[in-house]
């Protein structure tokens, strides 16, 4: 077939060197290579970008306005492309309304199921709600007191956008005189103009009555008319009282509580009809967190117990005046530890004295005096200032003392009581979503046989769709998640696999899928399931391209493309392409070296014993952790492992890192639940090294992040030419006026908006991309301008600045972590996650080590090739050799086998996790039968021991 291949000719995007490549269609293809070799440039920035661009360009210009505009990649030609879908790790929603259920669309099916099959109950008495007859409605109204005025309303429109002219005209034609719109009364003979883009509620006034004898017949007729107009709903608006809602469909005869209509939107927490009115469907409020204001209750006010903006203790301050007044009233001094103060005193300090006044003494330059005033409380004060301020800085400052607290009305369930009273199998929609996916599948299997024939007929197809999607999530190792889990709390790997299941559920064929390391965050045990899922996607008739470093995934692929041979300027070529055997045979392929065994990451011959001290987390209870005590040996390379969802991130990121950051670094983050951490006296600081960008603007680069650019600017300012002109280091900054080119403000490029076409970036015509003005560029050091230096690779700069020890030392660390190919001025936004992390590592290596630092890394091998992992391990071992402690969350067995100590959590994910399954050296963990990590580690250690015995 002519169309069974994707043919790429002359790809030059980023560092690609005029690449020509032919890929088979409808196959499972892995693209691999060193970090920075150009594989993402080929997969995402060339193949996906062109497939997506062509599809978008086929749409109208109006439609293109609402879609992401993509640049045309730098490539001569690509043939055989299909519409492309990219599933990367960067698109996790941070919208608090976005959950696993909404992202996977399972929640939409659940809303449909509960609307059609759910059994409504009274939220007060729990009685099953049944239909009301007109007689029952009349009886309820006749219970009103004699003389009570009321009107019968027909709600023809409920919370719907539009001008509603059709309904208003129909009411006029039917002879009605009045209508109630959004709570306001209107005469129908006047012109009524409603805002088109706002939701409205329109209620026709059917009749106006006063309670007296003999109105039963008229009331029944009016109610029947209202029911006919609305399809079964009527309201009785009691003047000066509460409105009574009646339904021919569902209502509690005892409490009169009725549900107007069991529609899917009633079960949506994003719709005012069903969302909890207090929290508007968020389930939480942002409130000032008293734990952040009083993080250490062992301290007194004078010692700085209060950590709140405007309330830090200082002698002679207004804060001190209030503290002394509170102390006099509630019996404490400024030297009383918070934990020894009465509950009443602490409550007054935080939440105020209500109407009670306190005595305060104020002394200033005009004299002294006694004042009596109420105290609003630190919490109330901060919340009021947060509401009233227009300053973004102040909002951010006070916001750092706030955290989400559960809504007191819905208790975090997001929906109204009447909605939560609708159940299937005894569980409401929120209860179902709070179960793990594993438990949800069991619940469906247990309850499906109990449904009536009618329920099965209505909900059978819906339940099938829900089951399929839940099983897809289970198949990619996510059965520990709940549908209620906020999408913003998911890791990159989790969110990517969730979107992957959505695509499988859509069952498209003839599509090109491009995925970015889907194995991230996945334990080896679940990797086989993921590979089967990717093959399933291929078998539907799709082409699946995966950027991946995982050995099992490579060995399962139909076709492998190895990009290299090195990284950056040393990469950008196709080193090898074909089957696993072809890659292993390729002489220039570093991937082939590791797959064939020509190179390998060796197990250390000895394990460090540590320095004898420990950091001990007592009673860890965050998320699914089950009140466990965990000991971290100091002075060792510690690896925390376990099945996805077993509690690793809760233990390390939420408890250990946040507690250490608060205690040692003065951070304000709220740590996860535990009884405390022992051994803090043995460490002096904690450093978290993640894969977040080193800067979010093109102005950030490796030179500015590591601080080496300050030293370079100083060197330029000390040249004879600079001294003669009076140029200081600031002259050589591209961020401030003076030395930079003002035409492009030091960017070197200009952005030209093209509206319906992608924005065009062109080199600045004035400085020709050099960033600086002509006068600044006349100053040279060793015949090079400051712009020339920014364009140097780290390798070149190490040689160039060899006689500048301070600069050379910082540059050498960048070289040590494998970033020799990166230019000093390379924009931070173009660095991969792995590269950004290694820049941070280099920055830490360049510092003078105290030997008492704890380094915490979460899956540092993400985005790293086997050769990069090898180099990363060497860097981490250097940090530990200096006496520091490195704690790593990891699934990569090559890194795990090199650790001194392993803490394995499990045994499963979610509610079945949260325990320590095994701990000790890799050899000790490998012998624990219940440890999944140990099961995969054992053959690896045995293989290494065998090769070592053979002298290989």
Language model regions located:
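Conserved phosphate-binding elements of NTP-dependent enzyme cores
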Residues: 1-952
